């Protein structure tokens, strides 16, 4: 997936990812950190995405995992 496509897909799921962070994390700064970490991991691990049409589900799963790790450090 090229960079422009990846950015487009991330923007499409940004709202959903934010809602996930709101459900899992209390502090706004933790939510912003989780969003940023999710984007970074999604970029670095895009080779693990099997089919582009599952990008949203895949990104949400990454976000959930990031939030779980964040909550464990609190």
Can you say where each PLM-predicted feature lies in the sequence?
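A short, charge-rich alpha-helical start-of-domain segment used by transcription regulators
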Residues: 1-19, 23, 29-35, 43
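Structural recognition of an alpha-helix C-terminal capping motif at a helix-to-coil junction
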Residues: 19, 33-40, 44, 53-65
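Arg/Lys-rich amphipathic alpha helix in sigma70-family domain 2
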Residues: 50, 64-73
């Amino acid at each position: 997936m090229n960079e422009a496509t990846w950015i487009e897909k991330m923007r499409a799921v940004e709202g959903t990812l934010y809602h996930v962070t709101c459900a899992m994390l209390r502090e706004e700064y933790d939510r912003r950190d989780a969003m940023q970490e999710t984007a970074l991991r999604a970029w670095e691990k895009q080779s693990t995405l099997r089919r582009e049409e599952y990008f949203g589900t895949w990104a949400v799963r990454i976000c959930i995992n990031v939030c779980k790790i964040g909550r464990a450090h609190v």
